[in-house]
């Protein structure tokens, strides 16, 4: 078995080498995992020599999905005509997006093969804050909903331990782009207190039910920014600020930097217990369909234990690619990542590796030669695929 595995690895490596000059697996989207994926050649799990994707374009989940579903590179601020091979998104593919893909005659299933959506890593959404002189903050989920909806407007309305906070306006730092991080946050806040946060969306204004620029509650303060890096820097440089962010852009286990929610910091083993409550579609008891991309990404609106703002960051592919080099590299990523080879990298970026059952389920479904859903299946991809 080891000899066979070695031969397979050598063969795959040779194929990757032969494809090196022509390969250009291009994509982007969510800024949440951009450091993990790699924004320069060799600095991430996608841009390493194996599998050798092009640098990830970190923008927002909404922009990544828009570029992928329309095959329009300009939505990621790339040159027009560049083929988009995948998207990174913390925002789950919607029923409408899936159905539009399936029914499209030009940029969907008929041309590119079935849609694939797979989780890459679990993530918390951290709540960074900056209140001068304060080094610990614990908020309930309900308080958090009231802060982001403008009902709590001053830190004197909040206790820091047993001491009331200073007379200082709360400054909410929110994402103005189509952010999957926003969607994970508001999915939880809506589940806990829909009177304050009536929606869950990649659009902050849609989720809270008002435009923070033109129609914010009287007395509230909102500062809109684009991207995870901007959230981190704005909170750090603004007294009274609070925001929400990828754990990879902040010191997520430091109580002086990020708030505890319901008594828990974003780091913690209890998050793994929450993830283990969901079975992958390949499990016979899951009640899910492996061929349905919507069934591959569960949500956790209000976990019963541990840190409550959690979700998955995902990748979106098509099954078919016209460039054999693209197929080789995408399959190489699926093989390595879902064999657990990137688990240490995932952890080092403050994310949580997928449960073993999920790793195995993705690998057996979208990589194994016996699966009809595998990327590059010639029986499905004969004459079709995402363009060169």
Task: Describe each region flagged by the PLM.
Residues 1-22:
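Gram-negative bacterial Sec-dependent N-terminal signal peptides
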Residues 23-388:
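Flexible loop/hinge segments at secondary-structure junctions
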């Amino acid at each position: 078995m080891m000899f066979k595995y070695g031969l397979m690895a050598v063969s795959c490596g040779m194929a990757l080498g032969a494809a090196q000059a022509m390969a250009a697996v291009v994509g982007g989207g969510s800024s949440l995992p951009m450091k993990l994926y790699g924004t320069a050649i060799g600095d991430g799990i996608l841009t390493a020599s194996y599998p050798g994707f092009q640098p990830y374009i970190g923008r927002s989940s909404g922009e990544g999905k828009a570029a992928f579903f329309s095959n329009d590179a300009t939505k990621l601020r790339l040159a027009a005509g560049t083929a988009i091979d995948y998207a990174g998104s913390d925002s789950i593919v919607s029923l409408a997006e899936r159905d539009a893909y399936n029914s499209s005659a030009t940029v969907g299933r008929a041309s590119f093969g079935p849609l694939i959506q797979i989780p890459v890593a679990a993530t918390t959404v951290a709540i960074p804050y900056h209140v001068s002189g304060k080094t610990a903050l614990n908020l309930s989920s309900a308080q958090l909903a009231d802060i982001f909806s403008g009902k709590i407007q001053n830190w004197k309305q909040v206790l820091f331990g047993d001491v009331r906070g200073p007379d200082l306006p709360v400054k909410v730092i929110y994402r103005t782009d189509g952010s999957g991080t926003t969607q994970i946050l508001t999915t939880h806040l809506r589940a806990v207190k829909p009177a304050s946060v009536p929606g869950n969306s990649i659009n902050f204004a849609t989720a809270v039910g008002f435009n923070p620029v033109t129609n914010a509650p009287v007395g509230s303060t909102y500062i809109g920014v684009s991207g995870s890096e901007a959230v981190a820097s704005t909170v750090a440089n603004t007294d009274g600020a609070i925001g929400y962010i990828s754990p990879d852009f902040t010191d997520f286990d430091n109580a002086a930097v990020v708030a505890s929610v319901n008594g828990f910091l974003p780091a913690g083993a209890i998050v793994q217990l929450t993830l283990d409550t969901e079975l992958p579609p390949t499990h016979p008891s899951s009640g899910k369909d492996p061929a349905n991309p919507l069934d591959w990404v569960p949500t956790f609106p209000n976990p019963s234990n541990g840190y409550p703002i959690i979700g998955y960051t995902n990748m979106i592919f098509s099954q078919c690619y016209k460039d054999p080099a693209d197929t080789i590299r995408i399959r190489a990523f699926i093989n390595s990542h879902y064999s657990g080879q990137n688990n240490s990298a995932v952890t080092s970026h403050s994310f949580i590796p997928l449960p073993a059952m999920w790793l195995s389920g993705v690998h057996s479904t979208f990589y194994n030669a016996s699966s009809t859903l595998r990327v590059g299946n010639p029986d499905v991809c004969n004459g079709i695929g995402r363009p060169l």
